[in-house]
Regions:
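A short, N-terminal "cap"/entry segment at the start of jelly-roll beta-barrel domains
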Residues: 1-37, 124-150
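Short acidic-glycine-tyrosine-enriched beta hairpin
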Residues: 7-9, 15, 32, 68, ...
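Short, conserved beta-strand element in jelly-roll/cupin
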Residues: 39-45, 54-72, 109
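Hydrophobic small-molecule pocket/channel-lining residues, especially in calycin-type beta-barrels
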Residues: 48, 56, 69, 87, ...
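Histidine-centered catalytic micro-motifs
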Residues: 51-57, 92-95
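A hydrophobic/aromatic-rich effector-binding and dimerization subdomain
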Residues: 109-130
């Protein structure tokens, strides 16, 4: 049986408290979408960044709702504010950082959902992102290839 349709209201969805002031609200989980996609909204204070990494099995998209994000996709660096969209295809190293002077809100989508399953698992455990639970990310096809490039 395929996925059932549903509506997720703004104040709904399980929250992963990743670090003080940083959270991810899971808006569409893999099991709800027949594993076709996973979507979450991240609140990222200024200075929040990711390691340079890539996904083996999922493409990643980002849509900046507020604040400013600097993306590095492959060798290209782009700074964008609200309305900026980014596509990070599987196999291409990428990273991002909250820049500018305010906390950012960013909507992220993985398709298919495999890479997002790591976030679902970490939300259940309420594991702080600083512990860098690499084995969870690796299990779901995400591989770090370097430190934050910013």
């Amino acid at each position: 049986m395929g996925a059932k349709g549903f509506v997720m209201l703004p104040d709904q969805g399980p929250v992963w408290n990743m670090a003080p002031g940083r959270s991810a609200t899971l808006k569409m989980q893999s099991g709800e979408t027949g594993e076709s996609l996973m979507m979450f909204e991240e609140i990222a204070p200024v200075g929040t960044t990711t390691n340079f990494h890539f996904h083996h099995y999922s493409d990643e998209m980002a849509y900046v709702l507020s604040g400013e994000i600097t993306f590095k996709i492959g060798e290209k660096i782009t700074v964008g504010g609200p309305g900026t969209c980014a596509f990070m295809p599987r196999g291409v190293p990428h990273a991002w950082k909250t820049t500018g002077g305010e906390t950012a809100r960013v909507l992220f989508i993985y398709t298919p959902a495999e890479a997002g399953k790591a976030l679902e698992e970490l939300q259940q455990l309420q594991c702080p992102v600083a512990s860098r639970p690499r084995q969870v990310f690796q299990r779901h096809g995400t591989e770090a290839v370097g430190p934050p490039p910013f």
